[in-house]
Amino acid sequence: VDTIMKDKSFGEAGEQLVIEEFLEGQEVSVLAFSDGNTVLLMDSAQDHKAALDGDKGPNTGGMGAYSPAPIFTDILRQKVRDTIMLPLVRAMKSEGRPYKGILYAGLMLTKNGPKTLEFNARFGDPETQPLLVRMESDIVPLFEACIDGTLDQHELQWKTEPSVCVVMAAEGYPGSYEKGKEISGLDEARALPDVVVFHAGTKTK
C-alpha cells in the first residue's frame, strides 16, 4: 500500500485503492454460446497461468490447459448455468442489450460455491484449443444459431477422451524475450497421432 499510495508507483492511478475479498480455490474456465435467450455451455477446461512448473514464476496468458476439468462436476455445471450464465444473459436482454456470441466466465470454485472472477466476450486462450479438438459438433451452425436465436434447437457432442494443450513460449516470456528465433520440430510434431499444432505470434519465411 505504501508503494502504491505514498511512493506513487502507479502515479495518479494509485490514489484510490479497491480492497476485495481474497478467493481461495481452483479456477475453472466456462465457455458458452448465447443467442440472447438460451445459454449452451461448452465442456469444462482449466488453464495454468504460472510460467514455470509447479505453479511457480510470473503469471502469463496461459502456459497450458486441459479439458475436461475433473473438479467441474455435472452438479456444478448446472449451478453455474442457472445462477451465473443465464442471469447475466437475461439481465442484458432486460436492458435492451441482448448478448449473442461467446461468453467466457473465469470462475473460482470456493468452499462457498463458484464465484465469478471475470467475464469475457470471446473464447479463452489456451482453453479453447483443448475444447475444440474434443468437440464433435459442427461449430458453424452453432454460430448461426446464436445469430438466429435458435440455440435451443442444438446440443453439443463431445469426444470422451481428454485433451491437453501445451504452450511453447520463447525464453523469458512473459517478460522481455528475443524475437525472430527459428522454431524447429513442428513437422515431426504434426506427424504424431492425435497432435495438432496451433500458431500464435509466429510467421513463416
Specify the residue positions occupied by each region the protein language model found.
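Internal nucleotide-binding/catalytic subdomain
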Residues: 1-130
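A residue-level signal for beta-strand positions that form part of recognition/binding surfaces
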Residues: 16, 41, 163-165, 194
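Active-site "cap" helix and flanking loop/linker of ATP-utilizing ligase/carboxylase catalytic domains
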Residues: 81-103, 120-192, 199-204
